[in-house]
Amino acid sequence: MLTPKKLALAHTLGPVVVDIAGTVLTEHEIRRLEHPMTGAVILFTRNFASAEMLRALCGAIHAVRPGILITVDHEGGRVQRFREGFTEVPSMAACRTAGDQTQARLAAAGYVLASELRAAGVDMTFAPVLDIDYGRSAVIGNRSLGSDRDEVERNARALMSGLRLAGMANCGKHFPGHGWAEADSHVACPTDNRSAAEIRRDLSIYRGLALELESIMTAHVAYQCFD
């Protein structure tokens, strides 16, 4: 039962992002989508059987809650949840090795992945990755847009231009930076033992893109100088 106390707590915490178990909605999931504090849905590989079924699932979600955000981690390379019927977008590391064609390639990658997702009913992908590739983090690795802050910022701007052209919002991640932490935060608690000044170098990417970023995803990392 949603008591006044629970409702007050929910409003303090804000809307939550929920997941779906399979390729069709269950009655329980429909009730959860109807809850006023459900703000978005995140899809995974388990929610994908075909492009047609994905469109049907997204349509069903939007029918229950018109305007709810349907999201996915679909960056290209090894982080691409949907394969069959979708373009195999190269990793960001592959895209950024095209010399003077790098910006055009990244813009094209952003447009292709965003336009295909939009056609399926997905509203947003969690991209770009704004973590600097220090050569330490395997979970970031070739997902990174550069090995220094200027390269990351420049390449992210190109990728976001493609997303924008297809009508998709962006999400910079993993704030304030996951490139130095070695552990995979999906299975462990990574730590970053750098100084505050060094971490602020990573964070400056977000400052440089502040007028263009529409959302951010935080890192699940313990920053020893702060935490």
Predicted regions and their residues:
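Acidic (Asp/Glu)-rich catalytic clusters
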Residues: I30-P36, C58-R65, L165, L209-L211
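Enzymes and membrane/adaptor proteins characterized by extended Gly/Ser/Thr/Asp/Glu-rich
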Residues: M37-V152, W180-T191, A219-D227
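Phosphate/diphosphate-binding glycine-rich loops and adjacent basic-rich segments that engage nucleotide
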Residues: A169-A197, D202
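Conserved, mostly hydrophobic/aromatic
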Residues: V41, D73, L117, L159, ...
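Acidic, His- and aromatic-enriched active-site or binding-groove loops in soluble protein domains
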Residues: G99, G141-L165, P190-R207
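Short, well-ordered coil/turn segments that N-cap beta-strands
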Residues: T12-G14, M37-G39, P66-I68, V122-D123, ...
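Short, acidic/polar
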Residues: A21-E34, R105-E116, I199-Y206
